[in-house]
């Protein structure tokens, strides 16, 4: 079958604003098709992630329009191919191909309010004086813009000084890369890994709370890398979903994070949610009055991911039906179907449930989310998992990320607590008391 990529690009261009088509779709390169999958290559991890998040459906629809058959779309970067990983690469000062920066995440489109202004100011200060606030540690719940700030720092530093080498990486990628290197059982491969990371002027490290998911050597390697960069006044920026003292990492590593600047990003307040909605609606030409934006902002949870989800739903509706059918009543209907089926629970986030369990069981948050097997901590931990899953409908995989553990451990914890409730009435009573408070908040 002939995959006519140029025609597919033309079809996609009809559906996406020119600015975004130029930045994210045009750079994609057709690689091959096999087994009903179209394989594309992206020039960077940032572009790959953005396309997978926002535009994969547009590409699959365009393939169907041109080819007349349904294909899945797979996107890889060159760095994800094994042949690239096995090379001994020490990047040139002029080569930022492995920076993994998303070019769309910049300071100018980061919307601020009281909930994130300190973190935003700290991020800009790092750009103005790299190495002065070292490390910069950003923390806050999921979906509040930590990753956006990391990329903004990197993009602005590269803009000011193209000679600087910048690397954005999350803990999962770092873990996988390190484990892959170690398994080569080759001293040269390990040295190449170390030299490459030591060569960066700026390291942007996301989701550090998951660094404990690998072998002991992974934390040791990161500790050595941190010290190497820190001693040479190279800028390090770290992001996490919790304060540094709550990280499930070695104390000697956590102690290094308090030397610099720590900035808390809180859940989005009402005005920030309105501003984000307005910006996203404008991007996709979705009509909305100020009253409608206020109505939506009041009902959405305090992070950007739920917000992006509803925008995606509206974009698909607008594409499938006529533009004029997307009335304010229809927007409300779509929003309620996706997010607002249980209005009594609006605003109750996983963080609030965790805090409530800590309060009712007199267990510190760091102990509830930690790895300790003390008898005082295990039942409250399992109670929290059950509440998150059964009452807030949080997926088990996400609960695993919250507790820095595996999907199977979450299942085991939930099952254990259900068994406990059958024989220990006080835990059953506490479960129903907290469930009632959440359900009728």
Swiss-Prot record:
InterPro entries: AAA+_ATPase, Chromosome_initiator_DnaA, Chromosome_initiator_DnaA-like, DnaA_C, DnaA_dom, DnaA_N_dom, DnaA_N_sf, P-loop_NTPase
Major location (coarse): cytoplasm
CDD domains: AAA, Bac_DnaA_C
Pfam families tied to this protein: Bac_DnaA (PF00308), Bac_DnaA_C (PF08299), DnaA_N (PF11638)
Cytoplasm recorded as keyword: yes
Biological processes, Gene Ontology terms: DNA replication initiation; regulation of DNA replication
Region annotation Domain II: where it falls in the sequence: 71-99
Region ranges (Domain I, interacts with DnaA modulators): 1-71
Segments of this protein annotated with the region Domain IV, binds dsDNA: 319-441
Protein residues bound to ATP: 143, 145-147
Residue stretches spanning the membrane: none
The organism's place on the tree of life at top rank: Bacteria
Compartments (UniProt record): Cytoplasm
Region feature Domain III, AAA+ region, mapped onto this chain: 100-318
Keywords: ATP-binding, Cytoplasm, DNA replication, DNA-binding, Lipid-binding, Nucleotide-binding
Gene Ontology MF terms: ATP binding; ATP hydrolysis activity; DNA replication origin binding; lipid binding
Keyword presence, NAD: no
Gene Ontology CC terms: cytoplasm; plasma membrane
HAMAP family in UniProt: DnaA_bact (MF_00377)
Function of the molecule: Plays an essential role in the initiation and regulation of chromosomal replication. ATP-DnaA binds to the origin of replication (oriC) to initiate formation of the DNA replication initiation complex once per cell cycle. Binds the DnaA box (a 9 base pair repeat at the origin) and separates the double-stranded (ds)DNA. Forms a right-handed helical filament on oriC DNA; dsDNA binds to the exterior of the filament while single-stranded (ss)DNA is stabiized in the filament's interior.
Subunit structure: Oligomerizes as a right-handed, spiral filament on DNA at oriC.
Family to which this protein belongs: Belongs to the DnaA family.
PANTHER family assigned to the protein according to its UniProt record, in alphabetical order: CHROMOSOMAL REPLICATION INITIATOR PROTEIN DNAA (PTHR30050:SF2)
Domain notes: Domain I is involved in oligomerization and binding regulators, domain II is flexibile and of varying length in different bacteria, domain III forms the AAA+ region, while domain IV binds dsDNA.
Protein name: Chromosomal replication initiator protein DnaA
